[in-house]
Amino acid sequence: MSTPDPREDLGRLAALHSLRQSGGYKGTTLVLSLLVLTIVIGMAVLVAVRGDGDESSTQPPQVTATDTPTSGTPQTPVTRLPDDAFGVPTTDTRGRRVETPTNPLGQVLPQTTDPSDTDEPEAVLPPPEGLMWQRVYGATIPFSTSDGPTAISTDGVPTGFAHTPQGAALAAWQIGQRATWAPDDQNAALLDRAAVVSAAAEPEADNLRTNGAQIYAGNPGLPAQMRDVPVAVRITTYSSDFAHVEFAQPLTRDDGFTAISVGVDMVWRGGQWKWVVPEPGNDPSRLLISTTGDGWTPW
């Protein structure tokens, strides 16, 4: 298999930037979820020193705005999965199993296990019970049988995450991925009901409400690994009303760094975890030598 030219990914990002600046998209900046955008930019910029040249850039299929209803009626929490809940499973680019739900919004799972009661910020964060990664909007999104979610509204807002570190981590990745890849009407619902937006972050949220899905409408072909299962997760700060969650994705570089991480702030408001939309200039990404120890654990 031929080795892909890393400059192609940089070129795609440059073309998108040029299009946004010329008015091809609404607004002067088009903000994706920080969960994915930081990793996209970091990996595209750093890809020139990668050594793994055989990863596919084929994009998983995406659902469009016409695939889902737009009202906010929640799913009823399930006690038993329907027989046709899932189609044929797939894998991400690293071979991790990903289920294919027949519901394009994702399939909530029966909550059959008590949530974790671990709240030590320095403790290793084990995955929730019954963790399942599902392909939703072409991305990989986590569900569990212990820490939620317990419902998803028909306009794509997940709820019912446990008031635990695992619940915060599940909510962070769920909300971030949905805000990145979902149709724009669902982006708006997520930001209205599952996010906290400061005055400084409002321009970023406005762009995401109206432009989120448009960046991929032209099929720019960003690397497929942007939709992968995170290689490791950790929580560095946790209290009853706040959690700082970090996710890592792998890199192969000549200087010893093996991954790039991004941090996400979550707050507990109104009985649910909500994503704190980052303000402009906030860059919580960093390079990692290892995702072994130091609180990191694979999920």
Please annotate each region the language model reported.
Residues M1-G27:
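Terminal targeting segments of Actinobacterial cell-envelope proteins
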Residues T3-D9, D184-Q272, V277-P298:
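Structured, amphipathic secondary-structure segments that form assembly/contact surfaces
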Residues V31-V45:
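Hydrophobic membrane-insertion alpha-helices, especially the h-region
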Residues G42-Q62:
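C-terminal region of N-terminal signal peptides and the immediate post-cleavage residues
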Residues T58-Q75:
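Short extracytoplasmic/periplasmic juxtamembrane "stem" segments immediately C-terminal to an N-terminal membrane anchor
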Residues T76, L81, G156:
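Residue-level signal for pocket-adjacent positions within structured domains
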Residues L81-D147, S261-I289:
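Short beta-strand edge/turn micro-motifs at domain boundaries
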Residues A139-A213:
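Core segments of small alpha/beta cavity-forming domains
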